[in-house]
Amino acid sequence: MAGTVTVPGSSTPSTPLLKDELDIVIPTIRNLDFLEMWRAFFQPYHLIIVQDGDPTKTIKVPEGFDYELYNRNDINRILGPKASCISFKDSACRCFGYMVSKKKYIYTIDDDCFVAKDPSGKDINALEQHIKNLLSPSTPFFFNTLYDPYREGADFVRGYPFSLREGAHTAVSHGLWLNIPDYDAPTQLVKPKERNERYVDAVMTIPKGTLFPMCGMNLAFDRDLIGPAMYFGLMGDGQPIGRYDDMWAGWCVKVICDHLSLGVKTGLPYIWHSKASNPFVNLKKEYKGIFWQEDIIPFFQNVTIPKDCDTVQKCYIYLSGQVKEKLGTIDPYFVKLGDAMVTWIEAWDELNPSTPAAANGKAK
C-alpha cells in the first residue's frame, strides 16, 4: 500500500507517495552522479536506467538506489527482431523503460536536470508535484481562467458548466525547466545566452483540440491510461532526424487523449536544466524536422480517429496507418516510422499481455 506525504504543520496527508506504483526512467550515456542531488526525493522509488550508446561501458549509479539497468544488448535480447523499433544513440531509447515497467505511473528525467528552487529558495520536489497533477482531474473540455480549479484556494469560475466540473482523468503531467530553455537549434543560435528565470506558479490543462511540443526531460504519465502511445519514434543512429522524439510522442498522445477524453496538464513542477546542448549539432539533427513539422502538425490537427478505436492500442495502430498514408508522401522515413509504430505496439503487448491500456473515458 502506498504511503503518504504529510505537509509540515498539518495533520492531514497531502499527496500519496505512490512508492510502489511509480518507476523513474532515466536514459543516459554517463555515470549518474546527478542522482545525489535527487536522493531525498528519488531514493524511495525504483529506477529503470536505459543505457544508450556503447553497451560495454559501465554506468556507475550512486549507492543506495534501487534500480535495474538495460543496455543495447539487453534490449536486443528481450525484444529480439522487434528491438528495431527502439532508437540507438538518442534519448528516445528511454521509451524501452516505459515498456518494461510494471508500475502504474512513470516519471522520466534527463541526467542533466537538477533540483530547482522555488522563489522562496525551497527545493522543489518535482516528483511530488507530478503526482498531485496526475491524481487530480483535468479540464480539457472547457477552459477555467483560474487555471487548475482543483488546487487549494481555487475553484471553477462563474460560467463554467456544472456538467463538466468532474473533469477528466489526467494521463500526462508535463513539467517545465528553469535556466536552460528547451529551444530548437535556430533559436539557440540567435539567443545563446538566454536563460529562463520566470517561475510561473500554475498548472493548466491543455484544451482538447490543441497540440503542444512535449519535452521528455521532466515528464510524468499514467502508464495504464496512455503508456502504449508513449513511443518516442525512430531517432538518432541511422535515421534522418533527431530531437523530435518527445514531440512526436506528444502529438500522438495528445490526439489519442482528446479522442479518449483524457487530460494533459502542463506547468509545475520546475527542474533546473543545467547545460545547453550544442546548437550546431542540434541543427544537423533537426534540419529535416524543421521543414517536415510544417506538414506533420497539420496532419495531427486534422486526423480523426474512428469511434470504434476504444483503446490506446487501437488508436495508435490507426495513427500508424495514417502516418504511412499521409506523411509517407513527404519522405520514405515516415513509412518506416509507421511500421515501427506497429512493431512498438506488438512488443508492448508481448511484454504486457494482461494489462492492455483501455480508456477510462469514452471515445468522442
Swiss-Prot record:
A motif (DXD motif) lies at residues 110-112. Keywords: Cell junction, Cell wall, Cell wall biogenesis/degradation, Cellulose biosynthesis, Glycoprotein, Golgi apparatus, Isomerase, Secreted. Probable UDP-L-arabinose mutase involved in the biosynthesis of cell wall non-cellulosic polysaccharides. Was initially shown to possess an autoglycosylating activity which is dependent on the presence of UDP-glucose and manganese. Its main location: secreted. GO terms for molecular function: UDP-arabinopyranose mutase activity. Glycans are attached at residue 158. It is found in: Secreted, Cell wall; Cell junction, Plasmodesma; Golgi apparatus. Belongs to the RGP family. It comes from Zea mays (Maize). The gene is UPTG. Transmembrane segments: none annotated. It comes from the Eukaryota. GO terms for biological process: cell wall organization; cellulose biosynthetic process; plant-type cell wall organization or biogenesis; UDP-L-arabinose metabolic process. Its EC number is 5.4.99.30. GO terms for cellular component: cytosol; extracellular region; Golgi apparatus; plasmodesma. The record marks 158, 165 as: Required for activity. Reversibly glycosylated by UDP-glucose, UDP-xylose and UDP-galactose. This is Probable UDP-arabinopyranose mutase 1. It is an enzyme of class 5 (isomerase). The conserved DXD motif is involved in enzyme activity. It catalyses: UDP-beta-L-arabinofuranose = UDP-beta-L-arabinopyranose. Pfam families: RGP. Its cofactor is Mn(2+); Mg(2+). Homopentamer or homohexamer.
